[in-house]
Amino acid sequence: MQHEIVIVLDFGGQYNQLIARRVRECGVYCEIWPYDTPLEKIISKNPKGIIFTGGPSSVYEPNAPMIDKELFEKGIPILGICYGNQLIAHIMGGKVSRALFREYGKTHIKYDISSPLFSGIPEHSVCWMSHTDFVEKLPEGFKALASTENCSIAAFGDDTRKIYGVQFHPEVVHTEYGQKIIENFLFNICNCHGDWKTSSFIEEKVNEIKDIVGNQKVVCALSGGVDSSVAAVLVHKAIGKNLYCIFVDHGLLRKGEAEEVVSVFKDKFDMNVIKVDAKDRFLEALKGVTDPEEKRKIIGREFIRVFEEEAEKLGDIKFLVQGTIYPDVVESGVGKAATIKSHHNVGGLPEKIKFKQIIEPLRDLFKDEVRRVGIELGIPEKIVKRQPFPGPGLAIRIIGEVTEEKLDILREVDWIFRKEIEQSGLDNEIWQYFAVLTNMKSVGVMGDERTYDYTVALRAVTSIDGMTADWAKIPYEILERVSNEIVNSVKKVNRVVYDITSKPPATIEWE
């Protein structure tokens, strides 16, 4: 089935993926393409509309990103945001100037609510501005549609040509009614129908995978994370027992995690899950290593070797499943590519294994869409809504050398912290929460005896997307319960500290 599509042309703005997500949330499929995509390719997709993103450039800079003026003559509805707004005005014959006062942050705005772009929203509202340049004079045929105190043309449009520009950012949550403005563009102006549904995506992918794979075997590296789990279940729905999932237990997972992964996919979905106990191998390779980057490299190398050994035992397998998602595609600069593409070998895998093709069933989806697909496929919420967990696992939540004793300590501490957060009902309010075993020991007193044991750190943050984060204001009584249980039930720990550093300057993980 060919979905209606809206194309987001990327001019280097920080919110390009957010714009695409907002469009998808309206049930309209969209893709992010480079601004210099040839006009013929854009036209060939027959888009219902085009959105120009913001960007750091000024239209008057020598190498400022531009667009073919002919695009405006094709009858395709266009919405320019921030730089995209200035670009439309500049190319169409208006004037863009440098503002005396830079507008940044929340700003009061007045809309012309007779415009189809602002239909159904209050005349006075709040928007999010982030600009230095502004449209001073409109091109012929355009009308001002909004204004702020410092920007007399905060939006403009031509209803006949269906070309519009907004100086503010409707895609960010700080703009009141921003989503409604995007909906108006999609449904009032582009005449979209909203045919992008999770259920139709699953059906289409299942049929596509069946056609490509046929009766051949497929292998998948299953980590228990959201992306690999959803990809595996989706492919299994298509080809059943011809899918072989290799789950490498490197001994660096949280308490009960390995058993849970095997139980869910083997018992609930009746999938071929090959569990490889490689704990001793990984610990031996990590012996004496304290540098976090070196830990990552060693774990990655050993994982590849173990996966390779197990995959070879399965015989001639031509297909590998990867949990690539759309942000990976966009950030790699690859742009749109086929869902299933030919490769000589997998990025990161040695050339000892040569897969004919990689199956990436989720490469068109954002993370929130992946979660929705997972829920529709029947994957338990505890896996679908799992918090971000680093590939190297607990190895980078142990500061210094990784040993079996330290892993046992951290598993118990982390389990106590996570259990208390969940029982307190805070798990849906906190973006991520976990424990870190520091390499610091301190003096304590327990049972009238002197102790000299480890200090553990608790880390909990609130965030929207993980790019920035604030430390979570967990009530003192909950922290007190966690601390008491840890020092009373976990041997070799006598001190608990709480990390109250935001990101930036700190990162969420310690290593």
Swiss-Prot record:
PANTHER family: GMP SYNTHASE [GLUTAMINE-HYDROLYZING], GMP SYNTHASE-RELATED
Subunit structure: Homodimer.
Domain named GMPS ATP-PPase: residues: 196-386
Residues given in the record as ATP binding sites: S223, G224, G225, V226, D227, S228, S229
Disulfide bridge map: none
Domain Glutamine amidotransferase type-1: 5-195
E.C. code: 6.3.5.2
Keyword Nucleotide-binding listed: yes
GO CC annotations, alphabetized: cytosol
Active site: C82 (nucleophile), H169, E171
Keyword ATP-binding part of the UniProt annotation: yes
Protein's UniProt name: GMP synthase [glutamine-hydrolyzing]
